């Protein structure tokens, strides 16, 4: 999906949460900057995506989240797209409740371990990007 570093496409990624999030969108509207939001649907796409961002969607601002409500957060989306891969390379005997549960309860650690698996073993071609993230990247590029 990503053939070169995002900065070479003049794309910057920032993580924004809480109350400041909509302020960034308001700023982007005023500056007429192209912005893509990748977010969770939190089990209610209509309420948390369609309704919440209706005032911001435009030709320069788009919001992407999984439409499937069972993919309510990034970790679940990643697992659903890569269950066999993650169960094979990430799971350990200590994960009594399964790989997805581990990913949800240890987000930073899971992300770090996945990145290490991809980099150290050069397994990028085996890893699937969730569809909403792929669509977002294609739109912003």
PLM features: what roles do these ranges have?
Residues 2-141:
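Acidic, Mg2+-coordinating catalytic modules of nucleic-acid enzymes
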């Amino acid at each position: 999906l990503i053939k070169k570093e995002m900065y070479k496409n003049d794309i910057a990624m920032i993580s924004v949460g809480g109350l400041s999030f909509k302020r960034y969108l308001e700023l982007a509207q005023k500056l007429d900057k192209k912005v893509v939001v990748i977010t969770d649907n939190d089990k209610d796409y209509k309420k948390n995506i369609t309704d919440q961002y209706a005032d911001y969607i435009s030709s320069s601002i788009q919001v992407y989240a999984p439409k499937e409500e069972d993919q309510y957060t990034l970790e679940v989306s990643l697992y659903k797209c890569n269950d066999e891969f993650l169960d094979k390379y990430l799971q350990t005997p200590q994960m009594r409740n399964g790989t997805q549960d581990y990913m949800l309860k240890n987000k930073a650690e899971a992300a770090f371990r996945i990145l290490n698996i991809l980099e150290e073993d050069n397994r990028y071609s085996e890893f699937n990007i969730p569809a909403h993230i792929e669509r977002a990247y294609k739109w912003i590029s």
